[in-house]
């Protein structure tokens, strides 16, 4: 009898390691793909050779530079010039400066792009609003941005987080829900932008329409991009053997500032965050360029200056959805111990078209003899966020594994976006907002504790609207 009781306790404990107290939301959204917006939904702006698809990214390592990008139909004199100045009050005459962009175009199958202009502006003042203009004669268009505050450990800053956006009616809802939040200052975007490759011959016009679609946000706020599988555009059967060609031509970044040799992996420092961007679809095995770069970059992180260490990589390492299940496993096995040793705070991914937040877990103790092959709680591990739920044409990934595994804290098969409000070196507030009834409902939230300065276990503070 005593032996039976012992066996019963053992079985119960074994089950407890697999079945989680996490939440699988019962909110139901149709699995049908959202309607894609047509090419005509976002027409080119009026005016001769008017600039379009305007967007900005950080142009250096620490936030005193910006890359302003735009597209024009023709490469006319002056079309590569950007004029910019500090916003001033009253009758003060602004001191205007000019920058000159590099200009290129590309061909893809039967498509020829417009002229792609990328102007790098350096020496900006921190935490300052700038006005900028692109275009010539009667086609000048004006925008603005605010440079980030100077890097420091207690600098508050708010990031939006959007992934796998595409250009459907649901995508539009996601983007404008984020834009309605006055706190958002920059966007972390872990891949899959236009979904042009879901159309015949990777219809490059969808890259143009996507650029026009996101311009109302991307021309005013810095986007930090990771490349996803829908950016690969590798189609040798139609004469396109060069991976990432449209993405690299259209979306420049300051990768050289972080000593990277590729725009597909790089890092920046912004306010109190050190952000590392990795490429799921570039070689990352031992001694490859990405491996060597990441090893060196993690050594450079100074948590006394940038306490919040955030990584973006498109394919998730912890995912309990049957869609793309364990696709990120080889990269996890390669780098997870580095992330734990470096006390990474957050890892942001897309790829899976639903939402999930993990517990702080790791699976780094496994070897072929000890059988420790399941993730366990680890206070030094990051929280993994899967946010491939922007609204793209492929629809919702609504097939979660059952039972919910112990590493999964909250999961929901619906569209939305997230917001990360960094308060200081110890605390940041994270919320995920589902698209529901035309409102960005806050469905999941948690107060994050910094792994370097305050490595205390977080208490669940959300999941009240499941």
UniProtKB/Swiss-Prot annotation:
Q: Give the matching InterPro entries.
A: Calcineurin-like_PHP_ApaH, Metallo-depent_PP-like, MPP_PAP, PPA-like, Purple_acid_Pase-like_N, Purple_acid_Pase_N, Purple_acid_PPase_C_dom
Signal sequence: where? Answer: 1-21
Keyword Nucleotide-binding attributed: no
Which named protein is this?
Purple acid phosphatase 25
- GO aspect biological process, one term: phosphate-containing compound metabolic process
Cofactor(s) it depends on: Fe cation; Zn(2+)
Alphabetized Gene3D superfamilies for the sequence: 3.60.21.10, Purple acid phosphatase-like, N-terminal
The record's comment on cofactor binding reads:
Binds 1 Fe cation per subunit.
């Amino acid at each position: 009898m005593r032996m039976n009781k012992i066996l019963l306790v053992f079985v119960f404990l074994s089950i407890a390691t697999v079945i989680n107290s996490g939440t699988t939301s019962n909110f139901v959204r149709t699995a049908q793909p959202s309607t894609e917006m047509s090419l005509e939904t976002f027409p080119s702006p009026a005016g001769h050779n008017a600039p379009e698809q305007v967007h900005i990214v950080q142009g250096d390592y620490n936030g005193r530079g910006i890359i302003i990008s735009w597209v024009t139909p023709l490469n006319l004199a002056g079309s590569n010039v950007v004029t910019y100045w500090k916003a001033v009050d009253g009758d003060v005459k602004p001191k205007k400066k000019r920058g000159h962009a590099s200009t290129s175009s590309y061909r893809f199958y039967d498509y020829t792009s417009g002229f792609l202009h990328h102007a790098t502006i350096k020496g900006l003042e921190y935490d300052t609003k700038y006005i900028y203009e692109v275009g010539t004669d009667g086609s000048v268009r004006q925008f603005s941005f605010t440079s980030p505050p100077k890097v420091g450990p207690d600098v508050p800053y708010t990031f939006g987080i959007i992934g796998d956006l595409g250009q459907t009616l649901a995508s539009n809802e996601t983007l404008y829900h984020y834009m309605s939040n006055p706190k958002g200052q920059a966007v972390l975007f872990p891949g899959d932008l236009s979904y042009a490759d879901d159309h015949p011959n990777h219809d490059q016009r969808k890259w143009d329409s996507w650029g026009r679609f996101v311009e109302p946000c991307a021309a005013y706020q810095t986007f930090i991009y990771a490349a996803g599988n829908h950016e690969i555009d590798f189609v040798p059967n139609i004469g396109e053997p060069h991976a990432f060609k449209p993405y690299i031509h259209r979306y420049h970044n300051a990768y050289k500032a972080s000593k990277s040799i590729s725009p597909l992996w790089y890092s920046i420092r912004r306010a109190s965050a050190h952000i590392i961007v990795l490429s799921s679809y570039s070689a990352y095995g031992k001694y490859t360029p990405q491996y060597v770069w990441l090893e060196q970059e993690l050594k450079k992180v100074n948590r006394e200056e940038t306490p919040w260490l955030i990584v973006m990589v498109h394919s998730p390492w912890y995912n309990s959805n049957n869609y793309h299940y364990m696709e990120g496993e080889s990269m996890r096995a390669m780098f997870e111990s580095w992330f734990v040793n470096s006390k990474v705070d957050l890892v942001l991914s897309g790829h899976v078209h639903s939402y999930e937040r993990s517990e702080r877990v790791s699976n780094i103790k496994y070897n072929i003899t000890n059988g420790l092959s399941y993730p366990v709680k680890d206070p030094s591990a990051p929280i993994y966020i899967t946010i491939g739920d922007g609204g793209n044409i492929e629809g919702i990934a609504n097939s979660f594994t059952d039972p919910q595994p112990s590493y999964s804290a909250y999961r929901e098969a619906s569209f939305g976006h997230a917001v990360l409000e960094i308060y200081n070196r110890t605390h940041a507030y994270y919320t995920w907002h589902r698209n529901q009834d035309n409102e960005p409902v806050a469905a999941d939230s948690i107060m994050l504790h910094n792994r370097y300065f305050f490595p205390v276990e977080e208490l669940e503070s959300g999941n009240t609207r499941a």
